[in-house]
Amino acid sequence: MAKTRTKKNANKRVVKGTLDQKHTEKINKFENMSKALPKKKEKLKKHEAQLEELMSLNPNKFTHENIRRKSYLMDSIKNLKEEINSIENCSESLDYIVNTLPILVNYYDNGDIVDDDKEELISEAMADGKKNILSYFFKETSQQENSSESNNDIVKNGTGGSTSKRKKIQPSNRCSGSKTGKVTETKPRLSRAKLYDNYLNVTDPHYRKSVKKSQNVCSVPDCDGEKILNQNDGYMVCKKCGFSEPILLTTDKPNYKEPTQDSGTYAYKRINHLTEILSQLQAKESTDIPNKVYEAIKRELKKRKIDKNDLDIFRLRRILKKLNYRKFYEHVPHILQVINGKEPPNFSRADEMKIKALFKSIQKPFAIYCPKNRKNFLNYSYVLHKFCELLELDEYTNYFPLLKNNAKLLQHDKIWKNICDYQGWYFYKSL
């Protein structure tokens, strides 16, 4: 059965609110708050009585329900007192008046406001002879002000003596002059949309004011030409007078006027890899291990009933293998130091320099005796194990295990024996 999808009405008109509507909602809110004051006081007395009844009970016989009820009543009493105090002191309404009074005065009492059709559903309460919305807060001072305001809304027709009231005063007729007919400068006129925007900025914390993009106008006096962007050179150039000024551009597009640098490929250096392995063993590397790895290790230690102070590198490797965290093998000394605070193995500077010197010295004999079908260097853990044997650093040999595969271990021993003969070193068999 085919499904039918109802089309939305694309021409549906979205109605935008007005300042008059928002202001009326605020006034209604304040009135409702005042009407709700007796109920809040009654609720406060009721909660205070319930709390006093709970406080009179023996604390040793308190149940979880009593504790929750007591906490709820204390919070409710505190909130009710704050609300009652705010309503009685008119704190919220006074703050609203102080913040919005200049905007409301301009909106309702300023005859120079321009209706630019950006604010919809404009209230015509004043034009219909109803009270000004500010009358909720202020009383009219005199009848003369009302008569003068009504006279300003009367426009005489040509030579005829008849008069007619208009709901909106046309901006073109708002000019001041003397009896001789001389016209002076008109005051700057405001728009309803601008006032509405200012009102929302003051009253609505979630409202984001729309920021208009600044026009690219030339700064040369008496020019006012439009500036255009020359992206290749990074300049803003005036189309009228040719004035240019540099501008900072951030872009990922390449500039073809600038020469491109060749990113050359560099050969992998074995000595760098050896240095990295030594740093990892001594926990000197800078690495960031996720917290979930530490938490998983601690849970596994608790499950196996292993004291963290008895944990060593080899046990930690087995735990990481079980947890499927093999990629952290090379950071085992660092992880161990974080878990139990034990100092990792540490080579003296002299021993570390000797190891690096021995490593550099075997590069030439390795190139000579390396089988033709072999491309990679010897296993680094195997090489470091042999260096520790030659330098009599037996306490470090356990940190560099030999190969588990006997066939591969024999191949390494064969190459290493030739290197030892070439260098004049003593050869230690692995098997």
Swiss-Prot record:
Location of the region described as Disordered in the Swiss-Prot/TrEMBL record: 142-187
Zn-finger region bounds: unnamed: 218-241
Job description of the protein: Putative transcription factor.
Record GO terms (molecular function): zinc ion binding
UniProt record, GO biological process: regulation of viral transcription
InterPro entries for this protein: Poxvirus_VLTF3 (IPR007031), VLTF-3_Zn_ribbon (IPR014900)
Domain of life: Viruses
Compositionally biased residues, Polar residues: 170-181
Pfam families reported in the protein's UniProt record: A2L_zn_ribbon, Pox_VLTF3
Keywords, alphabetical: Coiled coil, Metal-binding, Transcription, Transcription regulation, Zinc, Zinc-finger
Entry's family note: Belongs to the nucleo-cytoplasmic large DNA viruses (NCLDVs) VLTF-3 family.
Protein name: Putative transcription factor R429
Coiled-coil stretches: 28-95
Organism: Acanthamoeba polyphaga mimivirus
Composition bias, Low complexity: 143-152
